[in-house]
């Protein structure tokens, strides 16, 4: 039997019913929008709690029927057949409610900025960075998310030295946040005549996209420089001074955008700067909450090797949860759900243990 905080569940249902009544009374538009947002957040939890209560009543009735010596044989047989199904349903609902009761990461519903950089391994690392980029692009397409390249620095032999994209849609950061870290590849490069396996790496950073309300950037804290865009590898060369470099003076964080429109460059550079500053704030808060930091999948450190992609064996291994899948080709085609779901489940189970709800 799972240990659930019944008082808290009752409070959630009461709050939901109160909001329902207030919204029916026709409040002012601003108040209605706020209420509707909270109402939507509570809806899943309340539905599960009501289903659980109904199933528990059903269980009690069946147990009473079985305990009653006056119950005829046919009814007893029906009750005995139904009871295991009801108990199974109750257990599943309890687990669902446990997850819904977990502390919510405020950034989970946000869009994300995805940054991929080639690491050790030269040209092969840049090619792998390109492979990872396409993997995430396909994953985003599978989930119906919008995926847009913000900037790219091409590798000398293909792929990317660095590429940045925005990913927009429902649950983007919640699903991508565990991708941050070092991704290692083991394969035979196309240029390797002897067939020797090379190891190279790329670093992935997933940042929650920050709104202006999330992070304040004061005008006096930034320096904006414009410069001539030279393009990468001779591409996108622009003879006007359109490239923009924004430096955040207090932290030294620098963002450069070098597409053709100076106005767009400034807006995109500010978008990335805001995300990096917001991420910095979140990291500091995580460090202060050292106990909760232990519950994260891995350390969250972007220098931590999190996953290995072994092409000769067709294997992908996530080292944080010791998960190995022998379907590398499908993973590279964007089939990431099995890995992502396992990472989320592992994170949730550790959170449940932390707050004493692991039953």
From Swiss-Prot:
Chain intervals with Basic and acidic residues compositional bias: 283-294
Database matches in SUPFAM superfamilies: Release factor
Record-linked Pfam families: PCRF, RF-1
Function: Peptide chain release factor 1 directs the termination of translation in response to the peptide chain termination codons UAG and UAA.
Post-translational modification remark: Methylated by PrmC. Methylation increases the termination efficiency of RF1.
Alphabetically ordered keywords of this record: Cytoplasm, Methylation, Protein biosynthesis
Location(s), subcellular: Cytoplasm
Top-level taxon: Bacteria
Modified residues (N5-methylglutamine): 235
Ranges where the record places region Disordered: 283-309
Similarity remark: Belongs to the prokaryotic/mitochondrial release factor family.
Main localisation: cytoplasm
Matches recorded under InterPro entries: PCRF (IPR005139), Pep_chain_release_fac_I (IPR000352), Pep_chain_release_fac_I_sf (IPR045853), Prokaryotic/Mito_RF (IPR050057), RF-1 (IPR004373)
GO cellular component, one term: cytoplasm
A GO molecular-function descriptor: translation release factor activity, codon specific
Protein's UniProt name: Peptide chain release factor 1
Lineage start: Bacteria, Pseudomonadati, Pseudomonadota, Alphaproteobacteria, Hyphomicrobiales
């Amino acid at each position: 039997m799972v240990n659930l905080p019944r008082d808290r569940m009752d409070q959630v249902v009461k709050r939901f019913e109160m909001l329902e009544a207030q919204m029916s009374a026709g409040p002012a538009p601003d108040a209605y929008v706020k209420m509707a947002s909270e109402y939507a957040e509570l809806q899943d939890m309340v539905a599960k709690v009501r289903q659980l209560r109904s199933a528990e009543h059903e269980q009690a009735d069946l147990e009473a029927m079985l305990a009653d010596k006056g119950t005829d044989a046919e009814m007893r047989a029906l009750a005995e057949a139904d009871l295991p199904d009801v108990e199974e349903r109750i257990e599943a609902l309890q687990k669902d409610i446990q997850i819904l009761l977990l502390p919510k990461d405020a950034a989970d519903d946000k869009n994300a900025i995805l940054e991929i950089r080639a690491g050790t391994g030269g040209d092969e690392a840049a090619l792998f960075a390109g492979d990872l980029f396409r993997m995430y692009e396909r994953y985003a397409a599978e989930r119906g998310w919008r995926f847009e390249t913000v900037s790219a620095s091409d590798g000398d032999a293909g792929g990317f030295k660095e590429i940045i994209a925005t990913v927009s849609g429902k649950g983007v950061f919640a699903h991508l946040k565990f991708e941050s870290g070092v991704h290692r590849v083991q394969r035979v490069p196309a240029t390797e005549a002897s067939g020797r396996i090379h190891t190279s790496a790329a670093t992935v950073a997933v940042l929650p996209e920050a709104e202006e309300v999330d992070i304040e950037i004061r005008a006096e804290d930034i320096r904006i420089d414009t410069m001539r865009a030279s393009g990468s590898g001779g591409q996108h060369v622009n003879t006007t001074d359109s490239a923009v470099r924004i430096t955040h003076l207090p932290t030294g964080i620098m963002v450069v955008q070098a597409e053709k429109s100076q106005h767009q460059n400034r807006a995109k550079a500010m978008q990335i700067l805001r995300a990096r500053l917001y991420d910095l704030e979140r990291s500091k808060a995580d460090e202060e909450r050292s106990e909760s930091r232990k519950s994260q999948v891995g350390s969250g450190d972007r220098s931590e090797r999190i996953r290995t992609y072994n092409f000769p064996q067709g294997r992908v291994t996530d080292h944080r949860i010791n998960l190995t899948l022998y379907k590398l080709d499908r993973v590279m085609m964007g089939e990431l759900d099995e890995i992502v779901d396992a990472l989320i489940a592992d994170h949730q189970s550790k959170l449940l243990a932390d707050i004493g709800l692991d039953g």
